[in-house]
Amino acid sequence: MNKLNIAGQSVIRFADIEVLRYQIDGFEALPLKRKLLVYHLSQSTFAGRDIIFDQNGRYNLRIRHILETIYTHYEVARETDEFVALEEYLYRVWFASGIHHHYGCDKFVPNFSQAYLSGIVEGLQREHALLLEYSEDELADIYAEIFDPTRSPKSTEQSGEADLVEASSVNFYDRGVGQKAVEAYYQALQDEADEDERQAPPSYGLNSRIAQTADGTLYEQVYKQGGLYGEALYRISAHLKDALEYVDTEMQAEAIKSLLAYYRTGNLKHYNDFCIKWVQDTAVSVDFINGFTEVYADPLGLKGSWEGLVHIKNPIASERTDKICREAKWFEEHAPIDDRFKKAEPKGISASVVTVAMLGGDSYPATPIGINLPNADWIRAEYGSKSVTIDNIHAAYREASRHNGMDAAFIADAEVRALLERYDGLTDELHTDLHECLGHGSGQLSPGVSPDALGAYASVNEEARADLFALYYMADEHLLELGLLPDADAYKACYYRYLLNGLVTQLVRIPLGANIEEAHMRNRALIARYALERGKQEGTIELNGLDLKITNYEALRGYFADLLREVQRMKSEGDFAACKQMVERYAVQIDADLHEEVLKRYKSLNLAPYKGFVNPKMTLRYEGEAIVDVELDYTEAYAEQMLRYSREYWTLPLNPVQEERLRDPRPSAKTLEKAKELRAKLRHSMD
């Protein structure tokens, strides 16, 4: 395969998904030591694959196992409509790491019947008894999870109309556990914190699942070696230990050692240690994410989804982000927010443009284009943050979208299309830089305000805050002075694209009649609809049908400034009520007529609204017993890769939570009290 044609190349398309390839430019030129660091970090990324499947739903590993067994062993009538539908369902399960849509959160509707599935399973059980060792009761339960529309309809519920925990099927909480009980549990932990924990608060609940005893007492099943997901964490840790031999810096080695201690013990203090060392290590060329990181999938915003990612710094492109970081204090001082909420001295803000080398967990197959970590506000305030803009993912998306007809279909004004053609690629990446590097790194909480005060609305608030910061500064003359934009018109491309996406084009991803659910989509809708409301009042923005017109871009910047000021206030003061009201007003409901027209126009283009990626296959080349190279293969197909990952990186039992209960059964409070009484009687009789 000609590697020059790899970026953005289509691998397969199914349902509402198109799978692409990305290219690791410059990998061949790396020294062997650095290639081996990438290799071992990548292996640790693959080893966590089963974790994200189980976190996304308690039946996912069993469903994946059954479907993969059928896919690889059922050899009769594979051309029928029902088998093709079953194949597509499996493809969707692979992509979403579960049976719910990776963006919309709704459960997939199978286009094959339960009778068809059960017939195949029964046949395979007769012919290959050891392949599918499930009882009739177990299979009935699994079939109900797949086919019953009233059961687990949504992975993450964010509507606020019901108990968010009970209404969500993500596997962070036992069935029957309610939102108020969880909030009380973690509030008690915060109230009982000692002085050290108050000074350096752990991210309560990040690496655990909430279970309950027979009498309803809550307790944590901690993700650690010897605990829940222990088998996977042992294997992840083994590859991290292998990586220690090839680290870029001594600080990177120390960070990995803290991460290993965290996986070994489950102690969140070790995770804080890891984050502090990781964020201070800015000299690395090869860096990584590995852990229970983002909390978007948890309706309460506490539980981290397992994620792995490896990337290589692009030193030339990073000159752009270096300029931004050096000016962090200037940007903070000039931000249009209340001075009380500004950082007095922004610390440790670093940013790079990177080439992703491997994706895993919550970042695979769908992946972000930019990342800013760590998430703990106190670490960001005291030690800073690291941001990355992922250039080869940007490039793959750009290549895949060339001449796809979207702009011609949704932008009537030829001058606007020309504006976007000229500046879009540049402003898109710069907006990501500003969002990740400065947006997430800006502002501070008022004294005594909990970082969890905004609850289920925290993720939308945080993404809106970062986007607004980037949008506001995109039009600033300071970017021209820094040489980051070519002229004073470039920012208009960013503004137009952002509003068009938030008001119109992102709706192609949502089924007619549904609400906006995903945090990033809600954020974009909130900002764009607020701006449109202001623009209508002042005659600066119009939306006639699907035709967007912006007549005063300077006024639009003012709207962004006003909204940023309020969004920052909500976070800094922990104003849950105001945040909820704003999100529910601007970011959830969709006008049905507009939505129908968007979908009709989009359908004519025959495009897939969601995209993701297969990874390059990375293998060691030996001469004798010596490793002489790490080679990349860009030819692996989608199903081929998914089946290989299941063969080579299956680390967990089919029902990890059940296995954990058998390993660590928790008695009820009543049982403990009886045991206490018996011990007292025994001591008394011995006396």
Predicted regions: what is each one?
Residues 556-687:
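Extended, compositionally biased alpha-helical segments that mediate assembly or anchoring
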Residues 23, 52, 58, 80, ...:
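Long, well-structured alpha-helical subdomains associated
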Residues 31, 249, 459-476:
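An active-site-proximal "capping" alpha-helix that borders the catalytic cofactor pocket
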Residues 443-464:
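Post-HEXXH active-site segment of zinc metalloproteases
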Residues 250-257, 271, 449-452, 479-497, ...:
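Short, glycine/acidic-rich hinge or "gate" loops at secondary-structure transitions
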Residues 425-438:
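Short alpha-helix carrying the canonical HExxH Zn2+-binding catalytic motif
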Residues 91, 99-212, 219-417, 424:
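Contiguous, non-catalytic segments that form substrate-binding/exosite surfaces or channel walls
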